[in-house]
Amino acid sequence: MKTITPDTTTTTSSQHQQLLIPQADQHHQPMLQQQSLLAAPPPTMIMEHVNLVDDDEKDPLALEQLEVSPSTKHTHSLRRHLPRIIVKPIPPEKKPMAPSEEAAVSTAPAPPTRLICSRRIQQQQQVKAAAAAAAAAAAAAAAAAAAAQAQATSSYPSAISPGSKAGTSQASTMREVLASIPGFSVKPRRRSNKKLTTAAQIEQTKDGKIDLETPDSILASTNLRALLNKQTFSLLPPLYQYNLIQLLPSVDREASELEQPSSSASGGSPSEAIRLSASCLNNEFFARACLEWRERLSEGEFTPENQLKLKTEAEREKNKLDPWKLKHFEPFWGEKNSRGKDKDKLESDCKNQKLSASIKSEPKPPATSQQKPLQQATCDNETELKFDLSTKCETTSAKTTVAVAVADKSSTFPPTGSQNNVLNEQQRRVLKRPSSSPSQRKQAPTTIATINLDDDLDELPSTSKDSKQPKMDEIVPNASGNVVAAPMVDVVDHSAVEMKIKDEQQHQRQHQPLINSTCDKIEPSECSKEMIVAMKQVDSKEDVDSIASAAAMPAIAAVTPHTPKPEALAPNPDVANQFVSYLQNVELAAETKAPLDNSNEADITTGTNSHDFVFSDTIDHAYFQEHQSTINHNFFTSSSSSNTATTAANKLEEHSDKPEDSPLPIASSISGSTPASSITSTSCTSSSSSSASMSSSCSSSNSGSTTTAPTTSSSAGAPTAPLTLAAAAETTLANVQAMLSTVAKLQQQQQELPVELNSNEMYQHVQHDWNFGDIKLSSSQSSGDQQRNLSHEAIDLMDVVQDADVIDDIMHNDVCHDVLGDEDEGDQEEDEDDEVVECMTEEQQLIDEDSEAVREIVDKLQQHQQQQNQQQHHQQLHIQDVVQLAQHSFMPQAHSEFGNDIGQEMLCDAVPMSAAEMEVSSTVITNSSNSNDSSNNISLCSSTNSLTINQMPHQASQQPQQNAQSNAQQQRQILVDSNGQIIGNFLLQQQRQQQQQQLLQQFTLQAAAAQQQQQQQQQHQQQQQQQQQATSSNSLGKTLPVALRNGTQQFLSPNLIAQQHQQQQQQQLEQHQQQATAQQKHQQIQQFALQQAQLHQRQLLAQAANNNLLQQQQQQQQNVALPTTQAKFIAKPLNIISMTRPANASPTTAATTANTASIPSAYANVVAVTGAQQQQSPPVPAPQQQTVQQQQLANHNSNMQQLPNVLTMKTLPPSGVPTTIAQQRLQPKMPTGKGRKATSNRLPPGAVNLERSYQICQAVIQNSPNRENLKAQLRPPAAILNQHQPTTTTAPAPINPVTLNVSTVAATPMSNITTATGSMAAAVAAAPPQNVLKQEELLVSGAVGAGALPAGLPPNVMGVGRPGVYKVIGPRMSGFPRKKYVQRKPSPTTLIRHVFSPGPGGATATAQQLQMLQQHHQSTTSPVPVQNPQQPAPEQLIHQNGNGQYVLVHRANVGAADNQAPRASSAPPMHQNQFVTVQNPLHSINGIPMGGRGRPASVDTTAGSGNVIAPPISATDALHHHHHEMQQQQQHQQPQPLGNVGAAANIVRRNIAAGPNIAYIDGSNTNSSAVALMEAGNNYIVTTNASPTAAPSPINQQPQSQPTGTQHQHPLLQLHQTGENTPPGNEATATANNCACSLNAMVICQQCGAFCHDDCIGAAKLCVACVIR
């Protein structure tokens, strides 16, 4: 093939180039560049081509590299990714024949590398036959060559030729292009060392020779703009002019293109039509392109040597890329848009190449059988095209061809309007992105629709990729919609064969009606979506044709698969029928819409289609038209919904593929539906469809993704429709339909690949979403009542729709969630769907037919799903149950309410849903790290839910109760992120509701831990029944996670409620302790089960175990304190542990250091239940804590914490949270020790100002062309998140958090824990120890504990922000070296030992005298001593961004050193005693003699420093450290319930090189450790300097329960309160269980002689203390 890649005009040419470029990279890259390079000078382009010609052997990448620099500035893409224009080498004879782009595309076959060379040649011939498009392509190629030649004669023409050459995919192709230019020599000139004089070079130009490569070229010193002007340009042959104009940005060639299409259509010379705009060659962009090209030429960039070098570098870089990331993310910055478009088009072309024979044949009936437009739909999604080409080529291609044909038809109709040109531009961009190149292609032949269709069909077979792109480009520019109508019919008849002919006929009918603004009738037929779009567009105006072409083309790309698919599906009759029926259904809905608002629908359709495409591409919002912009932002807002929706879309696709009958009934019923209702349904579908497009792109692995595109197109028609009044009701129907179809399909998929496949797809979707800013909007929408409404909207869509597009988006998300859930649980889904349909129909009250159709579909889907779901349900019962929480967390609150009905469906969906939602939750975790990031927004989108996931266990139960009780009862507090994103919605709920929710959570976890759950259920079954009432237990399970996701948390005045609850909690603490032991036993059982489970199941089970723990904790909370309300916190899945300032330092910040401990994330609430019922009623618990603390204060010195407890209600002010670990260290007034400078105000050597760094990164990213991708990777410092999460600070309860600690261990998100007591954090950390799948995959304990992340989530899902990944400082301590992380991975066990030392409540902690002593010492020490331990912990807190804005980069990479408090490398060696003293004033204060224990001071010191952080941190550590540690951490969690938050909990996190990651937690300072949350992954002991005071009674009860729980949980987990870290000699009893490695032999430190466990000591045989030195 001949490829001309304009150097400067790459962006312009890239549009065509994309179509021509077969390589995926080339596809994406050229598109951006085309768009970016607005004014690339054609001559420059030619020059690049010439240079490329010399580098014939060079890879197209190299050519791209050459061209990139000018385009980079314009497109912000790397040079090596410049788009290429592949011009088929048309002999001079052919050149006039093939002026159209299609010809150029078809001529692309020249490169032998392409598989379809022969096909392309055939296509070229076909293109000749269909001279219009082919002529345009040939003209482009010829124009480039002619320009090059003309320029060759004069240096100016040569400049042009290199530009065209730049697009060459291969040197040979470029040679052909240049060789085709008369008198232009492409022969590689002998490179002589002699430098030709200017005169000599000018003389050579007469022979057609010009140097386009070396810096010696005369062009390097020539003013290109003097050469490239209208006068010289007019000297070129018309064909050359036309082709060169194609390289210019659309703005500079619109007028000419409008005329050109007619000429192309007529096949006449395009010269007559070619008229450059006044400023096309005289503008800053063109001038810059000329200058850049000259600079690159003078720099020697185009020399063969440099080209080869650039090529190798590009290949080397590409080889470094992770295939998964390469699939879902642009490999290079700035490459996303252009390359995404190119890839989409190219991939679609690749698929179309397979389909091309059929598609081409389409215009020519023979090809119809091979039509596989599905690939076009797949094409819509970049990722799908890339990776699914091989897997989905058959299915996709079959569908794609139809889509192409339909697109051609629909696009053909619309081209008539003048708007068509404008819309075409937008569509071009949009379509390029969504790789709806077929649609654009269809439109591309601006001359006549007939030609367009033929060209498209021809191009698809010849070079589906290449031809597609040029067609799209041309189609967009060309607006000859009127002519298109008739030709469309002809083309359609050829291409469509049976179905397509019908479609075309329908389209023809539509086209006329469209023109006449009566497109409804035709649309319902096979091309429903495209037709609908076109019809709507036509209805608005005849110009709507342009809109239709723009909107219809996207719709065609996305939706076309349905209608054309019947034809294309001929090979796949089932799929074809299904898609056709589905399309018909959609069409009917769209059809109905069109009558309602012709103008509105047209506008809406256009916006929707573009939006859908954008969605599938996940690239540009800007391309949307005005309506699109208004609505698309909302949809983008629901981009998160697209995550879920993506799954839904996938399901829809598969459903449409598999269940033919259900889609058809939908179609019939829909057609009957009223236009208004259909509009609404379309509107509903549109957001879901956009998500579907996303899903298809993300889940291209799923064969059904093509179907998703159709869904998108149909819904695309109505995205604006929801704005119309009738839209609401209809939207629900559309959503239901989409959900049903999606469910049916997804269920099948899930059966095939129940967990991993979906999770991978989900991950892809999620990451795509991360790239989108839309999620942010969605999250805000999802938060608060809107979220509920949205969930209801999924069911009761109508109510919310009128409220706002945001609601629609959320509705779509909910629907997607529902669909996901439906997929997973077909049986449950049946009920859910029926209910949804019923609710929707009732609420809509628009059309009973719609509801009936939906019901029919639902029934069929239910039947189909029931079969699949039954299988999946039995197979994945435990996993699903585990996943249920995560899924529910993703479900909106309204959905959770509705989840009462839908619960089982959601549960069944849990596995696939969990995969998808896990992605979201992982995203959420990332979000928690950086709420500002788009990824954070994404998680918020689908997840306010995901945020809630952490809270899920506790909140989920609460929300179902709330839902059951009434929305009115719920009082919402919406947390807003620093970005203004809604972090979460907090519902003020009575403890009873919370308890009920907890029961629900427990119920959900039953499958994972049947016995434990059964007991819990028995305990709370009545409450659950009350809550559930009408809802099934499964729905309850769903509801619980949903409620948790909703982040329903109460912020009650801690002072009032806390005192009341304090007594109750104290009384109940004993019960909780008893329960805790039983629960711990259950947890152990669950943990073992999790360990045994498969890796993915392990993750799910681990989540389930965490949920169980949470539920148990919640139960304990309920039992302990049935206080009116629990403090609910939106637990962002932030893995970041925020350290709260010592209560003394900033009571508000400490918010109750003790209370903080009690405040976990979602889990924190659960923990609160266990630790002190106070959390259940956060305000009460905080006061209770205060009361207890006051009592303790009487007993102890820590009165400070009482104030913080009261303050706990307040979120930590940004200033309140210590911005740096150093600050935290400074806060502890206690002397840390001899060697420590922790008290100094100076920051530690590795300290990083996270907030400032984050701001800098934000600014850099904002200015980066790759901002979409980068935003997802940037995670806000936990301090920022905490500051903006008042709920997190809510210090729900309380110091009693001993229970809190337990639940926290299960799954308290670190970020939430930050506010919550350290015990909460510890619980979170501990929860995931056994999720072995991949410790990374667990995504940090926070996520797992939250259960927000599906076990199946690959570690990559978290992306950079994932806590498990050290790239991100976020949840994991960046200080933690990856090496260590790797080391940790091997270690499956992370033991968090909680030394229960009720400091303030020491008197109460009679159960354990040591704990009491420790607590007394702690209280004596006051929070400050705790803080000192924290200071040591800060090093470990490095990873915890939560409270400190400064992250300490861990300096010591020694495995053992991780647990030690950071020490200057120059610090003198410390004796064990010294180390204890220094690191743990708490230990000595707590009465735990560090040195006396006989263990290396480093071990105890670690614990000591951890004391402040106490259990919460340790649990958190375990979680973050290793998801696999979860079980142990869970075990620890219950020990953590050490009642005394006030007592500094010593958390010693030890990274054992041997592999088991052991987190040592001394529970002595639980209260002070409120802030001391530690990510397990951090290995850092985070001790908060919260006052050790804690309610004495809770402390006593907690310590008792904890030890019991510890014993039950694990011998290792059993921590003697005082003896956890004590050396074996000191406490014989405790020693065995104290250390995670206590079972291992003791080794003497080579340096200080301290006894250390073999696992605790590194290879150097040095204790932690010595290692630090």
Swiss-Prot record:
Phenotype upon changing R288N: Reduced affinity for ubiquitin and loss of ubiquitinase activity of the PR-DUB complex
Regions of compositional bias (Low complexity) in chain numbering: 635-650, 666-718, 1174-1192, 1404-1436, 1592-1610
Motif LXXLL motif 1, residue numbers: 224-228
Reported tissue expression: Highly expressed in nurse cells and deposited in oocytes late in oogenesis. Ubiquitous in early embryos. Late embryos show higher levels in CNS and neurectoderm.
Extent of motif NEF motif: 283-285
Compositionally skewed regions (Basic and acidic residues) per UniProt: 336-352, 465-474, 651-661
Cystine bridges: none
Superkingdom assignment: Eukaryota
A GO biological process held by the record: negative regulation of DNA-templated transcription
Residue intervals of the DEUBAD domain: 215-338
Annotated GO CC locations: chromatin; nucleus; PR-DUB complex
Primary residence: nucleus
Similarity comment: Belongs to the Asx family.
Biological role: Non-catalytic component of the polycomb repressive deubiquitinase (PR-DUB) complex, a complex that specifically mediates deubiquitination of histone H2A monoubiquitinated at 'Lys-119' (H2AK118ub1). Activator of the PR-DUB complex involved in ubiquitin binding and allosteric activation of calypso deubiquitinase activity. PR-DUB does not deubiquitinate monoubiquitinated histone H2B. PR-DUB is required to maintain the transcriptionally repressive state of homeotic genes throughout development. The PR-DUB complex has weak or no activity toward 'Lys-48'- and 'Lys-63'-linked polyubiquitin chains.
Full protein name: Polycomb group protein Asx
This protein's encoding gene: Asx
